[in-house]
């Protein structure tokens, strides 16, 4: 079941001197089981848009259809708990949301809140601890005794233990070292490949190029482009006009004098293949 936004507006502090439009006539449709990147400058409306996916914010105007739910300004909050099991959000620096006495209890909280038994919640917690790289030996420790990176992993495991159909992530790898970042992004990619939709808010264009198959670009509350990474990063004039960077692979390829690439390489593997083809007298295709 696709995600569909139709002419969605969102207004902060309506009918007050602080009134501000956070979303302006936003319409799009996303396919199931896709990996979607949501990009744009700070203040462009990315996080506001993300919070509409599970109705943490409801539209001031327009309609949202998602996992069988029809959301309008009049939708009652009473009907949204099951939606939030199907669509979960991971905010930037999610470790600040930790609150339980032990790592295990913190990860178990989400499944229990949505009806899992003690045994089911424990099994899910242990499963996702392993997947995010947290040793079972830490299960009985306070999450506040862990390193910053470990706390991040615990917080993400707590959301993923709910096993939502749609996982929304706001800069989840911000501040992590390169290896931890790669491992975390690979975890999200594996989750998408297992039959889920992943929506990633990010400023990192390398992650967009490496992982996404669909991109939404926000600017001043408006959706200004919806396309594939290949098409978006191929249009350097458009990127420059909107002050958006491109992946380091594309920048590197453009600096190689006398090398020709028929396609803009999005990943390291594509860049290497393109260089090899040039050295062998063939263009990258």
Swiss-Prot record:
SMART domains, alphabetized: AAA
EC number: 7.-.-.-
Binding site for ATP: 40-47
ABC transporter domain span: 3-245
Highest taxon in the source lineage: Bacteria
EC top class, as a word: translocase
Subcellular location(s) of the protein: Cell membrane
MF term (GO), any: ATPase-coupled transmembrane transporter activity
Function according to Swiss-Prot or TrEMBL: ATP-binding (A) component of a common energy-coupling factor (ECF) ABC-transporter complex. Unlike classic ABC transporters this ECF transporter provides the energy necessary to transport a number of different substrates.
Family indicated by similarity: Belongs to the ABC transporter superfamily. Energy-coupling factor EcfA family.
Protein name (database record): Energy-coupling factor transporter ATP-binding protein EcfA2
């Amino acid at each position: 079941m696709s995600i569909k936004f139709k002419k969605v507006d969102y207004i902060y502090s309506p009918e007050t001197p602080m009134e501000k439009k956070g979303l302006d006539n936003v319409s799009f449709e996303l396919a199931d089981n896709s990996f979607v990147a949501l990009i744009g400058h700070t203040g462009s409306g990315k996080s506001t848009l993300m919070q509409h996916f599970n109705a943490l914010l409801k539209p001031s105007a327009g309609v949202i259809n998602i996992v069988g739910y029809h959301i309008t300004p009049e939708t009652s909050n009473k009907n949204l708990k099951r939606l939030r099991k199907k669509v979960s959000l991971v905010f930037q620096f999610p470790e600040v949301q930790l609150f339980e006495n032990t790592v295990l209890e913190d990860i178990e909280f989400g499944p229990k809140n949505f009806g899992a038994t003690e045994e089911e919640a424990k099994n899910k917690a242990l499963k996702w601890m392993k997947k995010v790289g947290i040793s079972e030996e830490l299960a009985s420790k306070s999450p506040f005794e862990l390193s910053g990176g470990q706390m991040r992993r615990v917080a993400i495991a707590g959301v993923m233990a709910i096993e939502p159909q749609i996982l929304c992530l706001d800069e989840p790898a911000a501040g992590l070292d390169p290896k931890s970042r790669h491992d975390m992004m690979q975890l999200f990619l594996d989750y998408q490949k297992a039959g889920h939709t992943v929506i990633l808010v990010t400023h990192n264009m390398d992650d967009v190029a490496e992982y996404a198959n669909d991109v939404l670009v926000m600017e001043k509350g408006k959706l200004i482009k919806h396309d594939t990474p290949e098409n978006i990063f191929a249009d350097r004039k458009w990127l420059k006009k909107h002050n958006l960077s491109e992946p380091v692979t594309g920048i590197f390829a453009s600096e190689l004098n006398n090398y020709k690439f028929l396609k803009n390489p999005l990943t390291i593997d594509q860049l290497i293949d393109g260089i090899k083809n040039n050295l062998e007298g063939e263009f990258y295709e």
